[in-house]
């Protein structure tokens, strides 16, 4: 991390901080009794850890995104973030990346999941209102 510019370090730490705050806040709302959530977390961990490497060192193809999307649509953004965090922590243990890389990855996934949850809730709320108007 020493070789990074001050601006890059600020961006990384900002993303980690915002992601950590959102993760803590969202996971307080998690339904821990949902067994399907643990199955998805295990599938996500396997998919995240065993990604397909591309033609060069900087390219890989992760099928974990399908698991994250399914968790988001099926169980909501809080559950999707749980699956992302578990998947990335397992990958971190397996591949032993530097701490700031995986922390940044978790934060960089957490922020858009939170924002997508806000959009999804707004769109869903609007469609329920339209549905209610149509039934009158």
Model-derived features: where do they sit?
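Short helix-perturbing small/polar motifs within transmembrane alpha-helices
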Residues: 1-60, 64-136
């Amino acid at each position: 991390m020493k070789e990074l510019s001050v601006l890059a370090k600020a961006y990384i730490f900002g993303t980690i901080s915002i992601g950590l705050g959102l993760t803590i806040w969202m996971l307080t709302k998690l339904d821990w009794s949902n067994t399907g959530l643990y199955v998805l977390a295990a599938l996500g961990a396997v998919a995240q850890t065993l990604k397909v490497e591309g033609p060069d060192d900087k390219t890989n193809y992760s099928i974990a995104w399908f698991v994250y999307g399914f968790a988001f649509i099926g169980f909501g953004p809080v559950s999707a973030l749980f699956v992302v965090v578990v998947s990335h922590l397992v990958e971190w243990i397996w591949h032993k990346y530097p701490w700031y890389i995986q922390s940044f990855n978790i934060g960089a996934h957490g922020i858009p999941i939170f924002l997508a949850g806000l959009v999804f809730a707004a769109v869903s709320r609007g469609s329920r209102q339209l549905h209610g108007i149509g039934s009158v």
